[in-house]
Structure formats: C-alpha cells, structure tokens
Amino acid sequence: AFSGLKLADILDSLTTAEKAQLTPISKQQSSYTAKLSAYGTLKSSLEAFQTANTALNKADLFTATSTSSSTTAFSATTTGSAIAGKYTISVSQLAQAQTLTTKNAQPDSKTAIATADSKITFTAGNGKDPVTVDISAANSSLTGIRDAINKADAGVTASIINVGNGQYRLSITSTETGADNAVSISVSGDSALQSFMGYNGTSTDASNGMTESVTAQNAKLKVNNVDIENSSNTISDALEDITLNLNDVTTGNQTLTITKDTSKAETAMKAWVDADRKSTRLNSSHQ
C-alpha cells in the first residue's frame, strides 16, 4: 500500500499534522504568559503605591526638622516636635570620665603583688551599689588584676601602661563620664595591694596608692545665657525635643539653628503621585 510513497514524505506529513495540532495550544500558552506578566506588573505597581501611601501617612513627615550649627564643637538631633528657631550656645567644659593610675610601678606585669587573697571594692558616687572583685594571691599580678576587674562589670575598665624602662602601672577608668561617676577603691585582705591601688576619693590624700590622672567632671555650657551642667556630652533634657552632642569647647557664643525640613515630605508626595499615576494607568489598560 505504501509502495509509491517515500518514508521521508510520510514522516514530514505526520510532523506537520502534529505541529498543526500544537499551534492553538502554543498560542494559548503565549496568551496566558502575557496575562501573567501583565498581572505581575500590576501587582508590583499596586505594592509600590501601597508603600508610597504608607510613607505619606507617617505622623512625623510634615513636622520634620533639620539642624545646623555655626561650629563643629557641637551638633544636634531633633524629633518631629522640635520648634524651629535659633539658640545661642557656648560650651566651656566637656564631661569626662575619671582615670586613676597607680603611683608606683611594677617591674613586670606577671609577678604577684599580694601575699594573701583579697577583695577590691569599687564605690561610685552616683548611688550605685559597690562592686567587689575577688583577687587570689596567686592571681594578683597586674595582668591578673586587670583581667579580674574587666570581667566583673564594676563600672570601670582596667589597663596596663608600659611607662618605659621596664616599668608598668595599672590604670582604672570609669565607664561613664561625669563627676558623680568618680570612684573610690578599697582593698581588704592584703595591705600591700591596698597600698598599691587604694584610693579614698580625695585626690590630695598622700596615702592613696593611685593618683587621679584624669578628673571626673561634668559638661558645662550656656544655652541662651542659661547655665547648664550635665554628666554626659549627649544632652537630651536641656532643650525640648532637641538632643545636643558636645564635641569640644567653643570660642565664645555659637548658634544652633532649627528649621522645618520639607524635603522628606516633598519626596514622599512625589513618590505617591508617581505610584498613583502608574497604578491607575495599568489598571485602566487591563479593564
């Protein structure tokens, strides 16, 4: 029956017939793909509009402020409730943390100082509970004392200073600035260690084993000629809704300017308009 037909012609005919059956399916698939792509674009557009709408509804968007200073000695940050205006500010003193350094040096940082187990107690003038650090006689070298103090969360940090010529001193620094965060140090259990690092809080007492190499002090400044003193160089309670960040003392009076910042609102409004136009256009084209 197939004597007059070539096998290749038969195969071509069958292939053409199969392709003809697939053509409608392929067209339908392309149509669905196009619709899915369009819906995806519309979904992205609506999500962008929702994001823009959320941004536009932020409570502080239209009350935002910006700050500028006539000096690098201080800067400021504000909340949305800050009142626009100018402030005259002069800084006469920065807050600083106390540092105590042993008067006597040790020939190395590994040799034990105490001959008996002892307790080192740190007492701050800020009303916080004293913190006691246990020191064993075997661990009473500069290194051992430093490590024990730094593990104790005692409100101070300890370090060893190489002062040269094979001499080492112990340094204790408060973790917080301000006069009220100055500490006193007492040692019980070993008189040698007490003589080496005891400090009764009176810097002029010759019996102290440590000297106050950096004095604990508060920041002092004037705002609109009103004296302000603070334990920190970051002051959030002097001006309503304004936080001052002190970096240095000033030369005379300087000016802090607070202005209304409309740039964020303008950006948010433009983003909302653009998103609204795009979503409206896409929605109309798919109806």
Predicted segment positions?
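Amphipathic, heptad-repeat-like alpha-helical segments
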Residues: 38-41
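Juxtamembrane membrane-water interface segments immediately C-terminal to a transmembrane helix
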Residues: 33-36
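Bacterial flagellar/type III secretion structural subunits and associated motility module proteins
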Residues: 1-30, 43, 47, 51-169, ...
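Single conserved hydrophobic/aromatic residue that forms the stacking wall/gate
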Residues: 278, 282-287
